[in-house]
Amino acid sequence: MKTQVKALVVGGGAVGTSIAYHLGKRGWDTMLIERDELTSGSTWHAAGLLPLFNMSYATTHIHKYSVDFYKSLEAETGLNAGFAVVGNLRMAQTEERMDEYRLYASTAETCGVPYVFMSPDEIKAKWPLIRTEDLKGALYHHTDGYINPADVTMAMAKGARQFGVAIERKWQADGFHWTGSHWEVTCTKMVEKGGNLVPSEEQIVITAEHVVTASGNHAQRTAKMLGIKIPAIPVEHQFVVLEQDPALVAYRAEGNPEHPVIRDADAQSYVREERGGWILGVYEKEAPARFEHGVPDSFRADLFPLALERIEEQYMAMIHRVPSCEDSGLKDDFNGPICYTPDGNPLVGPAPGLRNMWLAEGFSFGITAAGGTGYYMAQMIVDGEAEIDMASLDPKRYGNWMTTEFAMRKNEECYDHVYILHHPDEERPAARPLRTAPAYDRQKARGAQFGWVNGWERPNYYGPLDAPEDFDEKSRSFRRGAWWQYAVEEARAIRQGVGLVDATAFTKHIVKGPGATAFLDWFTCNKLPRVGRINLTYALTAHGTTRTEYTIVRLSEQEYYLVSAGAWTAYDQDYLKKAIEDKEADFGRIELQDVTTQWGVFALAGPKARDVLRDVINDPDPATALSNKRFPWLSARQIELGMCPVNAIRVAYTGELGWELHHPMEMQNYLFDLLEKAGAKHGMKLV
């Protein structure tokens, strides 16, 4: 058994096997270790569906690659991957569901995914067993279908071996140590004992330049060993297999092709053929998260007891949609753990705070994503970045504020929300509010309807004061939601008067030290500002593509204040930190501080913004303190507003006069009240 490789993949499910295959194809000396047998985690009990439908640009590319890749595996390896290209029929019972599909169509066209819309009559003519009188239409992908998860994994494993990849079963990773140049991974031989898989006394250490973890349901164990947080926790997922349906058997005996995968999103379920019968898979309410502290050794290729009471509604919906199955008995059932993340997207990319450690965790649609994940992950590892933007899947989109309970509650919600209408302005309520700025209660009392960004509550708009709790949820639409009228009023206030925006969720970093200027000049692509001035700039990747947009304020010759998007605090900090470590020897000492939670931000914008600030600024000459001469565009000054010290930045992203008011977080309520009172006589509106 080899003990030194260029890349080590930990986990032998579909995802890990695909990554090993694609690294081997790129010519890398690669090994895969699996603590049990290949596919023994979630892969073996997956339904094997390959849906191309996804609202995410990156995920759609991943799924499309998988579907195309799986079709080529047999020719390459000689193994049939079990791909049934039957198509996927995604039905709509409402016009709003059709609107969702119309929105998706733009993503599909951008990514080159073929689709057609079908009318109820067209569906009935093509598949007469499907009841259609209550449908508005459907979205049909003719190029996808379903696959045998074990077969496709074994085909990828054979392909990987053909590229020289070593695959070792019954070896468990028990420790990771970074030496500064490579990883030393302590591995233990696993043995059978009393039906359980237990560690033996045999251990080895594998040396690898790069490590990829694809540990599936064991992600929490991986997180503990690496000393990081991975919000990938399994949720129970059920599907049942029915006995043969005589009407279906007769239909197929007439020479008709297999039905497509039938997705009834409004009934939270999918149906597909299975040997003359049907499989019903559901995404029901109240499915619990499991193994939040790790998978017990006694749980191997096991299942949970079926909870039929949870899926009764979906079972009846299947009978409604395919009436011929009503008399088919229950043949088999599955209730197994499927990993989820708080937003439903997997965690794919560099691990936070670690060098040459890569995560491929949290796949709720792992079979669909496996092929594409392996392809794009290999690009990231070998080339430095993928050919598509993978930021939406980056593991660092959650910071250290994330906890086990948060992940459990959000993952359960995500499972429950698989088939809800995914409006562009969708906000999900679980585990909220969690991160709130001091002015949260004041804003809520004034009608704020909040959005969620990186755990922070941030006002999206201000609705009626007497709005019910579900006002925002009921206001959503794929066309023009009820929030529109309030957004119009807020936009008009900034265009014609003045508005106050809470931008506290912005990411904020201090970069200082003898090497700060040289480093930032290298790190960003615009000219650095003079002291007291600001510039808008971008941090680039090693390949020269855009990674992060920054507002940079130069506080002194060697001290800078960096402001970036609130959603990417950990993402930006990790990139900054690693870049500083790489360049400190060249540029000199550089200090990085995350001050996001120390500073609140209000943005005051509109033609009357200067009038509001003039009434509260503490300055020897208030009349000129905020003039273009004393406070020009793209400049920054420390000012006092009443008793509050403020780092004011003359910038606005509204196209109007404006300032960002960066203030001590503990003084936010004081400043809010001060500005609200001063703004009242100028018609200031909360925005």
Language-model-derived ranges and their functions:
Residues 2-15, 31:
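Beta1/beta-strand and adjacent pyrophosphate-binding region of the FAD-binding site
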Residues 389, 394-687:
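Glycine/proline-enriched, intrinsically flexible loops and inter-domain linkers
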